[in-house]
Every structure is written in structure tokens, then in C-alpha cells.
Amino acid sequence: MPEETLRVAALGRPFTLGMLYDTRQDKLIPGPSLWDRKTLQKNTDDTSQRSCNFHITASDSIDSKSSLLDVEASLKASFLCGLIEVGGSAKYLNDQKKFKNQSRVTCQYKTTTNFKQLSMTKLANLDEQQKGVIEKSSATHVVTGITYGANAFFVFDSEKLDASSVQEIQGSMEAVIKKIPSFDIQGKVDIKLTEEEKALTNKFSCKFFGDLILESNPATFEEAVKTYVELPKLLGEKKENAVPLKVWMMPLKNLDSKAPEVKAEVSTGLVKNVENNVEDLGTVEMRLNDCLADRVSKNFPQIRKSLRSFQRQRNNYTSALQQAIAKTLPSIREGKEDESSLKKLLEDREKSPFSHEKLSKWLDHKEREINVIGSCVDMMEGTNTKIVPNQSELDEEVLAPGVEDALCFVFTSLESADSCLKAMQNYSRSLELRSTDEEPWYYSNEVLTKMRKKAKAFHDLAKPLKDSSSVRFLATAIANEKHKGATIYHYNEGILVTDDFSKPPVPPVETIKDKSALMWYACDLSLDPETVNYNLILSDDNKKATRAAKQDYPDNPARFDVYPQVLCKEGLSGRHYWEVELTEDYNEDKGVGVAYKQIGRKGKQHINLGMNAQSWCFGVDAVKSQLFSGHNNKWVSFPLASIGFKRVGVYLDWPGGTLSFYNTESNTLTHLYTFHTKCTESVYPELDAS
């Protein structure tokens, strides 16, 4: 009984009528033919088969791509294991998103032109020479029909996105790309987009996979539209540039009973299992690329090294698995093996270090590690902290001329032993991902809490000193088993003082002479525009207040409405040091100090700094040319020293119950006055120009 004709996708392969084909290997057999060219031409029927389709898909799965190219299960299995090399538009099958967090939309243009087939009734009887050709080849089929036309795929990719915006961007991309056919006005390009759509299309790239030869491939949306409009012309006036799209093949067994044949096919379910495994390994690659593109892996070589090692192992395993399937598949089709051998290959993967579970778990761990490190780095934002990749560059920074002190936030556990990578490298010993009693440092709540606490402390140290030329703030990774997760190194004059920095104790406040004693207690303050009086103007990022004519500020409950005063935004407890620079104009009283948040804001009665129980003030009296201190409307006067009162340092020891003021000059401090008081809530630094 004659076997059924086989129908397969051409996939860019150079099929011709009468060509021999081995379906066990899915391999074209060029060279000897059963019939000469003249006989083939004489027995060929050519019929018109005009069609044109435009299709949009947001799926990037193997199944979706195979469907667009009309690839059936058996041929798909051969493609997945690398038995066949595709060309033309079918190269689209090999292309996948680089990142998991990336939007992709694909536009397919497909046209068919004609169908050619051999009239086999006159060719079915073979002579001995023709049968000899079959015997000498490995062919199982002969090409008897071909549908011609062309496929073109425009693949539009967004840039790498946050996971939360992938679906939204993809939907917007799909809506714009669906408009492409409407931009073709009788063979001319007329692109009409809103400003929002233009902004969107400017952010995604285009790749082209087609059967027609272009002068240059489109890389942008606009270029893609122009190419789309030109595609019908590229087929040629007589459609001479059309290529095989679909191929019909007759089993040679129908012509010669001794011809080789396919004994068995792999079941559709098992092909789907192969597809799932290949796709899973592809997803691993995308997640790896997401990790490699993260700033953490770019800044920390230890992370990048482990990712690259994992990537190499994954690539090697994927290649080995495909080669094993490519060897097994033809044997099953020839009847030398059954499906169980292919099933075993896939089952062995699940028992190996390359199982879905273990690869996913390794990536989960690495993504967690990157996120933990990234969260600490984020906490250093706005501090001019420099990330240095290695010990050599760290030494350069701490030994740089003019650098007296350097604090370095050190990630200490990035080079921890990775049992999963070891298992991959020693596949013969199938180790577990991690021993059950070993908790990765980045999953320890205790370690994470400590790291974030240190990162916050580092930020609070670095921000107020970010413009200091004598102090450097750095971040790096150095293995240190004593401090799991992270610690802070302190260098003084290029020498490591401690690998676990904490603020040094402060000497008695009246005895402090050197600013370095208070350096690590410096804080970064900003004046609060909501509280500024109408006769003050704020500038320099709310770091400076200047007396001025009355301003048209909106009224609000927090604003001082009579006296030129302003509070800072930051409420302080703990120990803090800051400095205030005053103009040398002694025609105006000036006061600096702190106040509780509930200090009065409206009217004249006891609102000034120091005139109430909610505030403490130290300043200069312009009329008497003397210094004064005040709290709860009790005032003490002091002579104004010859050095003046240009820059005042303020040290708040909230738990110790002191508020001290110093005249500052270069690195020298001169103690002026100390309030001894026990604060009951946070205090806000204040300036008073009244």
C-alpha cells in the first residue's frame, strides 16, 4: 500500500523538484537525481497560488515561531537538536529575546506566488539505473511539489525594562506595530504617529529575517515600515525571486520497495518535552543576561565571574544535550532504538546539576544576592561613594595625595563557595545545590539587617562629607570571614586602622580643639521652605538663607510670619555636628541653635529662637557687638573675640544632654558655650536673622 506524501517546511533550504531527501536525518541529498532536467521540466505543472498575509504576535516561544513557519513536530525535533541548519526567514527560529525583562513583538509578512509539482504518473516506473541511485544514497523521499513565495519577519525589541512594565510596554508596542499596513498608501510610505507613539518607537530596535535580499536591513521602526512597503516589489516583476516555502515529498518506498524508510517517528508528546527542555535552557540564558546587565555585576567582578562561569557550564551542557539528541533521533527513526533512549536523556537532566529546579534555584540565589547588594548600594546614593573593583584600585584611592581618611563599605561574602558550580564542573558527582545546613548569607535576616544598618550608617557618614577633599568614601568586595555580609574599613593616611569601623567616642565637649574629633558626626542639613519667613530667601539647594524684602510666599501653619527665622527639615536625636557660615555684617543680629517642632510660628510673643522653652540659641548682638546665649528667655552675654564670629560649629549630644557651640577656623575649634539640657524629643536646627 503506497505511503502518504510528506509535507515539510522548507526553512530556507534550497529544495528543487526531483531532489532526494533523507527524513531520518532531515537532510537534503544534492547531486544524483532520478530524472534529468529535461524530463523534470517536461513533467512539471506550475499553477498560480497568490496569497498575502500580515500577522502580529507578542509570543517568543518556540511553539509560536514554529507555528508561523508551519513547522510540524518531527522537523521541529530535528531543528531543536541542531540536525538541520536553517536559512533565510527561518533564521527567526534561532532568535530569542536577550533579556527576560524585555518586551518583544514580531510582525510577519507572508506571500505565496505559485505551486510546482511533478506529474508522478509518468515518472513512477524506475529503471535499474534509477534504482541504483536510490540504493547508493541514504534517501527516503523525493521532492514532488513545492509552494513558492517569501516570508519576512520584523522583530521589534524594547530596551531592558523593569519587570513591572514589560506587559504594559508590550501592549503599546503591539498597538503601534498593528498600524504598519496602514502606512502603505499605494506603494508609498506615509507614517502617521502621535508624539507618544513616536517616543515609543524611538526606544525599540528592529531585526529583520527574510527570504528576500535587501540593500540594508532595517534597524528602526521607520526603516521597517519602508522595507515592508518595498517587499512586494522585491519579489520581482515575474515573482522570480520567490523561494521554496513548503515542500511535498513522496516516500521512495512507493517507487522502489528496497528503498530506505522511516521505521518510527518520535511521538508528539516527547517532541514537546524536548521543546520544553530547550526552551527552559533558553530562559536560563535570558535570566543570566538580566543579571549580567545589572549594575551590581558590572561593578563587582566577583559577581560577574560566577555568572560567566555558570553561563559557560550552561552553554556546554546545552550543546552536549543537543548533540546527544541529534545522535539519538535518527536512530529512533531508523528503528535501531526506541523512544525510551530519548526519554532517558531528558530524565537524566532532571537528576543532574542542570535540572530545571537546580538551575532556577541557582539563579534565584544569584538574583537575591544582586538585589541585596544593590539595596545597600542604593542607600549610598548622593554621597559621591566610588565603587572600586579590586584591591589595587582601592590602594590607589586610599593612598592618593591629600587623602587623610577613607571609609570603605566592604561586601565580605561575595566569594563564598558555590557548590552548584562545582557540581556542574564535576558532572560525574551529582551534588546537591547546597548542603541543607548551609544558609546563603543573603537569605539570613540577621545578616541583611546588619548590612542595611551599616549601609545607612555609611550614608550618614558620607553625605555631609561628600565634598571633602581629605576624606574618601569607597565601596568594594573583599573576602572577610569575620564579618559576614558587609563591614566598614577605615584607612588613615593609607593604613588600615580597623576592619569594623564605628564612630569614635567624643572627648569632653569643652576640651575639643581639633575638628577631626567631630568629623564622623557631621550631618547634612537642608532648610525647610515651608517654614521660611517672608523676609528670607533660600538658595544653594536650600543650604543658604539671605535677608530680603518681603516675599510673596503662600501662608501655611508651619511658616514663621513675623521674624526672619527658618528651621531645617531634619529632626535630630543622637550625636550630630554641623557648621553655619555667617556674613561679617554686624548690623544684624544672627542666631543659630535648635528648636522642638512645636515652637510657635505666628505673632511676636516669644517666637524668636531662645525666647521660649522650646528652643536654644547662640548668636551675635549687632548693637552691643557681643555674643549671647539664650533659652526660655534667659540670656547670657560674652565678649566678641577679635577673630570674629564668621563660622560657628554646633555639636549636639542629644543622649548626653549637651548642645555646644564653637568658633571654627580651618581644622581648629574654639569652645564658646555649652547648654546642659535633657531633650525630650527630636530637635530641628534653626537660623534666626532677627
Regions found by a protein language model. Give the residues of each.
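Beta-rich ligand-recognition domains in immune and ubiquitin systems
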Residues: 503-690
